Each structure stands twice: as structure tokens, then as C-alpha cells.
């Protein structure tokens, strides 16, 4: 994997920094694991905007990724590692011994030809999946379930991982990248290693158009709007907001805690930094 800084042959190329991976599959994705992905433009079924800054962008197919890794005891060969437009991580196409193929989140260091396996007796090796109670303390893991059998929910994006720091009774304690220490049921599954494409954070799109290709529309500042559109709007000439930062609906933003799931508060040993 190489970091390529483009020559400034035009204004749109001047600030482009690419992450080039020659090992990624250059052909089409595996068709039986594709699904149609329609664009909403950020609108709900009434046609009203429920999420701002969404619209346009290149057409995409959704790749059906196996987040459960529940095909136990059957070895699989990594056929190839692919780009996935729906996530920052790469995905790997596995071919199991019984002929079935599945996509998984590609772990760091896993390449075509490697053998992976899931289950209680799986070797301690990057890319293998098993319950947390079978993983040694101190191991780095990703693709962690919060409920047994529900599928991976934590540490799924590029370069993400967590560390298993303790095991006590029916729970294990994980240290997340945010600094949060959290208890998770030991029966939940996780995959060893960290997620691939950790260089994703080093890239620079270089121009506004590259963001538009990804289906993201511009974000207008509140102070640049009229009073009818935003609490920060209006005033003669350039003005400060005149109040603490709020959302377009007047709710406090920038630093206000938004977590509301009190039912699982007792699972958090230490808050994130």
C-alpha cells in the first residue's frame, strides 16, 4: 500500500492524496452477493428531508457482508480482497470448503490465498472469529458483537480495533479506540486482529467534487443564513452567532452529550476521553 501525492497539474489535483493498494481485486464484485441500493436524497417516505447534506453521487451496489461469522468449523480460503464503496474498510471474499462464498470485513494483513476459520476451536490468528471467552486477554480484536448472534457492531471501520483487557464471570472488558472501557458478554463473537485500510485517514479528496461523487452535499453555516432558516442567521454584515452554538432547531450542539440509552449505562466501566 502506497501514499501518492498528485502533482498540481490543475487546481483540482493540487491537494489530492491517494492511498493506492495494488493487491485489491481489479475486476467486478461477486454478483450473487450484490443487492440494489437506491438513493433517498435524505428524504423519508413523505418526501421531507430528514437528513441534511445527502444527495447525488455515483451509483452503487450494496455488498452483502457476513457480520455474524457463524459458519463454524468449515475452513475458508480468501479468494480476493476488494474495494467496497459502502464502507471505509476493504472486504474479503471467502470461499468455504463446501463451496459457499461470503464477504467479510477484511482484517489487516489478510491476503488472497490465506485460510480462515470460525468457531470455538479456531487458532489464535488474525481473521479467525470466535466467542470472546476463547480469546486470550491482551488480544486485539474487531467486528465485536454486543448481543450474541446479532452480528458485529463495534470496530468495523478502516483501521478500527479494540483490546480485550479483562475477563470476569460472564463478561469481558474491552478498551475501545475512543478510550472507553466497556463490558460485553463473553458469548459474543469477535474477529482477531484489526480492520484493514488503516491508511484511509491519510487520504485527501482534494476538491469539493470528489465529496459530491460520494453523495455528500455542501454544509452551509448557520451564520450565513437568514433568521428564518437558522437561530444564528441574520444581522447586518458579518456577525458572530451571538449565542452558544445550536442546531437549526435550537438544540445545543458542540459538546452536549447525546447518549440516551440508560439501560446499558452499567456496561460502561469508564467513559470515553
From Swiss-Prot:
Keywords: Ribonucleoprotein, Ribosomal protein, RNA-binding, rRNA-binding. Residues 34-54, 223-273 are annotated as: Disordered. InterPro entries: NA-bd_OB-fold, Rib_uL2_dom2, Ribosomal_uL2, Ribosomal_uL2_bac/org-type, Ribosomal_uL2_C, Ribosomal_uL2_CS, Ribosomal_uL2_dom3, Ribosomal_uL2_RNA-bd_dom. GO terms for cellular component: cytosolic large ribosomal subunit. One of its GO terms (molecular function) is structural constituent of ribosome. GO terms for biological process: cytoplasmic translation. Pfam families: Ribosomal_L2 (PF00181), Ribosomal_L2_C (PF03947). Coiled coil: none annotated. SMART domains: Ribosomal_L2, Ribosomal_L2_C. Part of the 50S ribosomal subunit. Forms a bridge to the 30S subunit in the 70S ribosome. Belongs to the universal ribosomal protein uL2 family. NCBIfam families: rplB_bact. One of the primary rRNA binding proteins. Required for association of the 30S and 50S subunits to form the 70S ribosome, for tRNA binding and peptide bond formation. It has been suggested to have peptidyltransferase activity; this is somewhat controversial. Makes several contacts with the 16S rRNA in the 70S ribosome. This is Large ribosomal subunit protein uL2.
Amino acid at each position: 500500500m502506497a501514499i501518492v501525492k498528485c502533482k498540481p497539474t490543475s487546481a483540482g489535483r493540487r491537494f489530492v492524496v491517494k492511498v493506492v493498494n495494488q493487491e485489491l481485486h481489479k475486476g467486478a464484485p461477486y454478483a450473487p452477493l450484490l443487492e440494489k441500493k437506491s438513493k433517498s436524497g435524505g428524504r423519508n417516505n413523505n418526501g421531507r428531508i430528514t437528513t441534511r447534506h445527502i444527495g447525488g453521487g455515483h451509483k452503487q451496489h450494496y455488498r452483502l457482508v457476513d457480520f455474524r461469522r457463524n459458519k463454524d468449523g468449515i475452513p475458508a480460503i480468501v479468494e480476493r480482497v476488494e474495494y467496497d464503496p459502502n464502507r471505509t474498510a476493504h472486504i474479503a471474499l471467502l470461499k468455504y470448503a463446501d463451496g459457499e462464498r461470503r464477504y467479510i470485513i477484511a482484517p489487516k494483513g489478510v491476503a488472497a490465498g490465506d485460510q480462515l476459520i470460525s468457531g470455538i476451536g479456531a487458532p489464535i490468528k488474525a481473521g479467525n472469529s470466535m466467542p470472546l471467552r476463547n480469546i486470550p486477554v491482551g488480544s486485539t480484536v474487531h467486528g465485536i458483537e454486543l448481543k450474541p448472534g446479532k452480528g458485529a457492531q463495534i470496530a468495523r471501520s478502516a483501521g478500527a480495533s479494540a483490546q480485550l483487557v479483562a475477563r470476569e464471570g460472564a463478561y469481558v472488558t474491552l478498551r475501545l479506540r475512543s478510550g472507553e472501557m466497556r463490558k460485553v458478554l463473553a458469548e459474543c463473537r469477535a474477529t482477531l486482529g484489526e480492520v484493514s485500510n488503516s491508511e484511509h485517514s491519510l487520504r485527501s479528496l482534494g476538491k469539493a467534487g470528489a465529496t459530491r461523487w460520494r453523495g455528500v452535499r455542501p454544509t452551509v453555516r448557520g451564520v450565513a443564513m437568514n433568521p428564518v432558516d437558522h437561530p444564528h442567521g441574520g444581522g447586518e454584515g458579518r456577525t458572530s452567532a451571538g449565542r452558544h452554538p445550536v442546531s437549526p432547531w435550537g438544540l445545543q450542539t458542540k459538546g452536549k452529550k447525546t447518549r440516551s440509552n440508560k439501560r446499558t449505562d452499567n456496561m460502561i466501566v469508564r467513559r470515553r476521553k
